[in-house]
Amino acid sequence: MLTMKDVIREGDPILRNVAEEVVIPASEEDTNTLKEMIEFVINSQDPEMAEKYSLRPGIGLAAPQIGISKKMIAVHVTDTDGTLYSHALFNPKIISHSVERTYLQSGEGCLSVDREVPGYVPRYTRITVKATSINGEEVKLRLKGLPAIVFQHEIDHLNGVMFYDHINKENPFAAPDGSKPLER
């Protein structure tokens, strides 16, 4: 079982590397790692489990965050309309995105970042992601709102990008041009 001890923190060079593609069909080892990742995210949202194992609540996790430089992500997030998006994916890739941008009014956080980083993180409002599911099936997901933001955040990790790299350094709270805020 993964715990916060397994989550590496900013400053570790692996978080700045471009992760490797996972060979499909995935090995048993990669599949088990991905299972542990989604289990961690789900457990972190369960108050009892989070307290018992000192887990920081999270809605997504990328393999580089646990020291594995491979393209794997786990996301477990509920949209504003109550729809649950729970996915454990190999080799996720954004294949299209909207012109319209958004940002979380409260800013973004990260399990690998133990400090508050103030500022707006510009994201695409809608994205389409292509990936391979944990069961080995090709999937294509059309996402908008919070799930789209979470997927962009996790896919950034696979490319060595941290959320705060997107924040305007001169004016952290400048709303990105033509964007609409998303409240969480």
From Swiss-Prot:
Enzyme class per UniProt: hydrolase
Family listed: Belongs to the polypeptide deformylase family.
Required cofactor(s): Fe(2+)
Ranges annotated as spanning the membrane: none
InterPro entries: Peptide_deformylase, Peptide_deformylase_sf
One Pfam family matching this protein: Pep_deformylase
Binding, Fe cation: 110, 153, 157
HAMAP family cross-referenced by the UniProt entry: Pep_deformylase
Chain coiled-coil ranges: none
Reaction catalyzed: N-terminal N-formyl-L-methionyl-[peptide] + H2O = N-terminal L-methionyl-[peptide] + formate
Catalytic residues in the record: 154
Gene Ontology terms for molecular function: metal ion binding; peptide deformylase activity
EC id: 3.5.1.88
Keyword annotations of the record: Hydrolase, Iron, Metal-binding, Protein biosynthesis
Protein's name according to its UniProt entry: Peptide deformylase 2
Name of the encoding gene: def2
Biological process terms in GO annotation: co-translational protein modification; translation
Entry's cofactor comment: Binds 1 Fe(2+) ion.
Function description: Removes the formyl group from the N-terminal Met of newly synthesized proteins. Requires at least a dipeptide for an efficient rate of reaction. N-terminal L-methionine is a prerequisite for activity but the enzyme has broad specificity at other positions.
Organism lineage string: Bacteria, Bacillati, Bacillota, Bacilli, Bacillales
